[in-house]
Amino acid sequence: SPLDLPIHMHAWERYFHADDRDVVVQLAVLHAQFEILHPFLDGNGRLGRLLIPVFLYERGVLTRPAFYLSAWLETHRDEYYRHLRALGREPQAWNAWCVFFLKGVIEQAEENGRRARQALELYNTLKQRIIARTNSQFAVPLLDFMFARPVFRSTDIQWQGPFPSRPTLAELVRALRESGDLLLLVPGSGQRPAVY
């Protein structure tokens, strides 16, 4: 009943802050309960998915709230809803739900690890190539900046430590563009800086 929603949300919030033995199982239960309670007219799914990294971060499992299960849940959408619908009807549904959810967390974590390894491999490849091509002490700081800001304006380039003169920086950017390591998205014009 909608009149009982505040009571249920209060209980949900208490469980959110409770110390459970297994944080990921607690997360599985919290996520399902939030989706079942459906407290808002719109956005419950998005908010329910956003609560996953927030909860893991709050519990110290993540150093940043940056673990998103959305892609995995979308891939397994039919099974996801089937498990959620079964929670109120089948005695073993909570166990099946937790197994399903934990499988998703594991598979998404493995995919995130694979992508992180690919990004590191790309970084190391580019690092060696850029150092060899530019022979500049500023090549690695520029590469670090590019990885931190994959899309940037030419006027945004900055980092801690020694910074090159504008002509040196322009030469570095030109060398990276010519080698294909930096893609010009929007040419600069007048007062408008280029976007890479």
Which residues fall in each region the model found?
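A short, conserved structural fragment
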Residues: R177-G188
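Short acidic, hydrophobic short linear motifs in intrinsically disordered regions
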Residues: A139-L143, A148-G161
